[in-house]
Amino acid sequence: MPDQAQKTRPVGPGPSGGGEGPGSPKVEKPNTEELLKRMRKVDPDQAKRYRQRTGQ
């Protein structure tokens, strides 16, 4: 049986610079204090679960 040749893939971006693809948008994080305050008005238990889920 012949040995299978392994193809090597380039690890990093190519020699062309790699700046052709779309970048991630620059988006500010939401103010979590304001979000929690609004959630407390709607459903206090939901605000508590959200704090537990996000670690705040």
Swiss-Prot record:
There is a cross-link at Q56 (Isoglutamyl lysine isopeptide (Gln-Lys) (interchain with K-? in acceptor proteins)). Keywords: Isopeptide bond, Ubl conjugation pathway. It comes from the Bacteria. May be modified by deamidation of its C-terminal glutamine to glutamate by the adjacently encoded deamidase. This could be a prerequisite to the subsequent conjugation, as shown in the other prokaryotic ubiquitin-like protein Pup. Residues 26-48 have a biased composition (Basic and acidic residues). Disulfide bonds: none annotated. The keyword Heme does not apply. GO terms for molecular function: protein tag activity. Residues 1-56 are annotated as: Disordered. The modification Deamidated glutamine is found at Q56. May function as a protein modifier covalently attached to lysine residues of substrate proteins. This may serve to target the modified proteins for degradation by proteasomes. Belongs to the ubiquitin-like protein UBact family. This is Prokaryotic ubiquitin-like protein UBact. The lineage of its organism: Bacteria, Pseudomonadati, Verrucomicrobiota, Verrucomicrobiia, Limisphaerales.
